[in-house]
A protein has these predicted regions:
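Post-HEXXH active-site segment of zinc metalloproteases
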Residues: 156-181, 185
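Hydrophobic or amphipathic, alpha-helical segments that drive membrane association/targeting
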Residues: 1-107, 252, 270-280
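Active-site recognition of the HExxH zinc-binding catalytic motif
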Residues: 129, 140-161, 165, 192-193
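Short gly/ser/thr-rich secondary-structure transition/capping motifs
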Residues: 108-112
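Active-site scaffold of zinc-dependent metalloenzymes
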Residues: 113-139
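Short helix/loop segments within enzyme catalytic domains
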Residues: 85-87, 179-240
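Short amphipathic alpha-helical coupling elements at transmembrane boundaries
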Residues: 135, 144-147, 151, 194-198, ...
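Cytosolic-facing loops and C-terminal tails of multi-pass membrane proteins
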Residues: 220, 224-280
Length: 280
C-alpha cells in the first residue's frame, strides 16, 4: 500500500507533466490534462509568466529525476566494482551452493573484518556479507540474516526505496511522499524480519544477529554505505525492530503526518477545482 501511494502519486504527476510538456513544446492538443487546464486558465487571466514558470518546473522535475537516478546507478556500479575487488570467492561459492534452493540468490562475500550485511543493486540485486560477519554469527544467526536479506532481494527493495526517495526529493510540494518513503523503509525491514522468523521458526536468530551487528558496527561503516542503492540489515528502524522482536504480537503503528497529508491533499484539491472551473 505504501509503495502504491508513494509511486502512484508521482507517476500520475509525471504523466500529467509529460502531456503538458508535449502540448507546450510540440502543440499536442490534450484538453483533459490538468496542467493544460492550468495554463489555459492562466492565459485567460493574463498570467502567462506563471505558465512559463510551470513549464520550467516540468522541465526541472524531469531533468532532476533523470539526474538523480543516473547518479544512484553510477554510485551503485562503482560500489559493486569495489565489492567485487574485495570478494572472497571461496566463501561466495559456498553460500551460493548452500542457499541455491532459495530461487538462486546471488551472494558476494567480501574480505572484511567488520560485520556487513546488505542487499545492493537496482536491476540485478545481490546480497553482500562480510567474512567478519560470517565468523561472528552462529549457524542459526547466519541463516536468519540470509533469509532477511533474501526477502529484500526477492521484493527488489533497493529499487523500490530508491524510486520513492528520488520522487520525494524532486516533488517537495507533495510532502506526504517524504513520509511515505521513510515509512516504507521501516515496513520493509519489519517484513524482512518476519521472513527470517517464519523460515527459522523463532525470533532468537534474527534478534541475536541484529544485536551482535549493532554492537560491532562502527559509525564509519554505516556512514560509508548511505550513498549506494542498498537495503541494509542494521541501518533502518532499529528501535522499532528490536521492540517487535521482543514482543512479536505487538502491532507497529505508523505515524500519520497530518500537516503533510493536508498540504498534499490541498495541492490535488486545487488542481481539481481548476479542472472543474475550466470545463464549466
Amino acid at each position: 500500500m505504501l509503495f502504491t501511494v508513494g509511486f502512484g502519486i508521482p507517476l500520475l504527476v509525471l504523466v500529467q507533466m509529460f502531456m503538458y510538456a508535449m502540448y507546450k513544446l510540440f502543440g499536442w492538443d490534450i484538453r483533459l490534462n490538468l496542467l493544460w487546464l492550468c495554463n489555459h486558465w492562466m492565459s485567460r487571466m493574463g498570467w502567462m509568466s506563471v505558465g512559463h514558470f510551470l513549464l520550467l518546473l516540468v522541465l526541472l522535475t524531469f531533468a532532476g529525476t533523470s539526474w538523480l537516478l543516473s547518479v544512484r546507478m553510477i554510485q551503485t556500479r562503482a560500489a559493486m566494482a569495489k565489492l567485487r575487488s574485495m570478494e572472497n570467492h571461496i566463501w561466495s561459492e559456498r553460500l551460493n551452493a548452500r542457499y541455491e534452493h532459495l530461487r538462486r540468490p546471488r551472494f558476494v562475500v567480501v574480505e572484511q573484518s567488520s560485520p556487513v550485511a546488505f542487499t545492493i543493486g537496482l536491476w540485478r540485486p545481490c546480497i553482500v556479507l562480510s567474512t567478519g560477519l560470517l565468523h561472528m554469527l552462529d549457524p542459526e544467526e547466519e541463516e536468519a540474516v540470509v533469509y532477511h536479506e533474501v526477502h529484500h532481494l526477492w521484493h527488489r527493495d533497493p529499487l523500490k526505496t530508491t524510486l520513492l526517495s528520488v520522487f520525494a526529493a524532486m516533488m517537495p510540494y507533495i510532502p506526504v511522499l517524504k513520509h511515505t518513503s521513510q515509512q516504507y523503509r521501516i515496513v520493509r525491514e519489519i517484513l524482512a524480519d518476519n521472513e527470517a522468523i517464519e523460515r527459522t521458526g523463532n525470533a532468537v536468530g534474527i534478534g541475536s544477529a541484529l544485536l551482535k551487528l549493532l554492537r560491532a558496527c562502527s559509525p564509519s561503516i554505516v556512514e560509508s554505505r548511505t550513498q549506494i542503492i542498498q537495503s541494509s540489515f542494521a541501518d533502518t528502524s532499529v528501535n522499532v525492530r528490536i521492540s517487535r522482536l521482543l514482543d512479536p504480537e505487538r502491532d507497529v503503528k505508523l505515524r500519520l503526518p497530518r500537516y503533510a497529508i493536508l498540504i498534499s491533499a490541498t495541492v490535488f484539491l486545487l488542481l481539481s477545482i481548476l479542472f472543474v472551473w475550466s470545463i464549466g
